[in-house]
Amino acid sequence: MLLVGVIEWRQRKVRKEGVSMRTDAEIMQIIDEAIQSIWKTEIKHDYDENWIMNEDGLKTALYFHLRKRLAPVFAEHNLRIFTEFKDAEFSESGFRPDMVIARIDMNSDAEYWRGAVTDCLAVLELKFKSRFLDKEAIYADYEKLRAYTERLDLSCRLYMATIWECEDDPTTWIRKNAAWAKGKVTELNASLTWGERKSQFYVHVH
């Protein structure tokens, strides 16, 4: 009974003070596995059922499923999801990622929670395009990711979630041997199969 009491006390202390029982690398691995799984299952299902019809729909679906899947991890480690994020490492960069999973200091005196962010654990850019010529807009977001790796001090993984409603083979948007993306970028891709035009959701890890 004493041991159980000690464990429960430590768990309460973790939630209150943000004392982590996992390393950042372990937390980011959990987040990474969840993001990849959600993309290939829940997001594909939502798209096929016509719940995702534009970029805002994609954003809200990702937010919902991440909250649902990772709720215990978020609570234990004081993690929150921010959209159109422009604080912490991004405050003076001129960039505003579509979505960020970040840790907050629960004891911060900041007026707003965005000011209480201590570090980012995942950064996501999103794109939903329907025309073949929209490829250039997708490539532009990859250039943003490249700028993040070159100009910002980020230790987390970067994700590019793209739904491109055109027929295509499962492929990557950036070269597989691109040095700037190696070990940093994960592509969450979706397109349509040739002929049948069925959705295909897949992941490429650089």
Feature locations, PLM:
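Charged, often low-complexity linker/regulatory segments
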Residues: L2, I7, R15-K68
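Active-site-adjacent loop/helix micro-motif of nuclease/hydrolase catalytic cores
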Residues: G94, S108-E111, R131-E143
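Short acidic, S/G/P-rich loop/turn micro-motifs used as interaction or catalytic elements
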Residues: K129-D134, E167-P170
